[in-house]
């Protein structure tokens, strides 16, 4: 039996052990992607999904083994080893094969790398509207911003947001997580966080005014977040955007843009 057939045979067992332990949004999104990759025989995506499962185990292994309600530690040990073994045995897709199977041309990839997805709670629309306007004032085109609280930046009608992100933003789109108490109180936002984290390697975190909680979920706590109320963070954001889009901005104009944004935050 070849490796792919064996993986398909073992997949339900692997998924069952994982879902028996947790149905958190991050894990369920990885598993959905894993299932899709197996159905399409996409080796590159299968390897990517297995890498994500391997990373999930690395982050959660200690918690699993310390949990007094987990009675199948051996099954988790075996499942993690299976994931590693399949990664070792599955062929690596070389660059020639990648170029022939990818759904995106190089021009489309470069275009997608410019996209910014604003992951936010609709209850924070006023602050996030001001933030999107800030990005546009710095020089980001409205076409490069995906922001569902605005009809000018939203996802096309009849499109499922998660499927749209998987289908169109898989190749390098940047995600801006706009964290607030409203964000963490929303199951929808947490699901969105999981889906975008799985499908994007590029992200930045922003702390909205009044946020009283702590950074949780899949976001790296050790990666410094931008505070919208800190002048130095706004400056660093501006510099980041200018580098991303190869833009220039006069200091005097930036001061006017920053002042307008700060006024809208109050």
Curated annotation (Swiss-Prot):
UniProt key word Hydrolase: yes
Cystine connections: none
Protein origin, superkingdom: Bacteria
GO BP annotations listed: signal transduction
Catalysed reaction equations from the record: NAD(+) + H2O = ADP-D-ribose + nicotinamide + H(+)
Pfam families (UniProt xref): TIR_2
Transmembrane spans: none
Name of this chain's protein: Uncharacterized protein YddK
Source organism per UniProt: Bacillus subtilis (strain 168)
Species classification: Bacteria, Bacillati, Bacillota, Bacilli, Bacillales
Gene label: yddK
């Amino acid at each position: 039996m070849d490796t792919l057939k064996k993986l398909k045979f073992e997949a339900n067992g692997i998924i069952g052990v994982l879902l028996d332990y947790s149905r958190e949004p991050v894990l369920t999104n990885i598993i959905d992607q894993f299932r899709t990759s197996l159905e399409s025989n996409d080796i590159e995506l299968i390897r990517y999904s297995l890498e994500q499962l391997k990373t999930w185990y690395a982050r959660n292994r200690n918690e699993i083994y310390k949990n007094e309600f987990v009675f199948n530690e051996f099954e988790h040990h075996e499942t993690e080893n299976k994931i590693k073994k399949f990664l070792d045995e599955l062929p690596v897709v070389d660059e020639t094969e990648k170029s022939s199977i990818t759904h995106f041309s190089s021009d489309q990839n470069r275009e997608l790398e410019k996209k910014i997805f604003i992951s936010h709670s609709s209850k924070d629309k006023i602050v996030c509207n001001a933030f999107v306007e800030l990005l546009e004032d710095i020089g980001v085109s409205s076409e490069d911003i995906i922001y569902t609280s605005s009809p000018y930046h939203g996802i096309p009608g009849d499109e499922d947001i998660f499927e749209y992100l998987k289908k169109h933003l898989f190749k390098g789109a940047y995600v801006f997580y706009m964290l607030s108490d409203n964000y963490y109180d929303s199951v929808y936002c947490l699901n969105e966080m999981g889906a975008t984290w799985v499908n994007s390697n590029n992200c930045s975190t922003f702390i909205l005014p009044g946020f009283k909680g702590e950074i949780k979920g899949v976001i790296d706590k050790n990666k410094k977040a931008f505070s919208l109320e800190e002048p130095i963070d706004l400056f660093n954001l501006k510099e980041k955007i200018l580098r991303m889009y190869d833009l220039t901005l006069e200091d005097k104009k930036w001061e006017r843009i920053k002042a307008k944004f700060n006024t809208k935050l109050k």
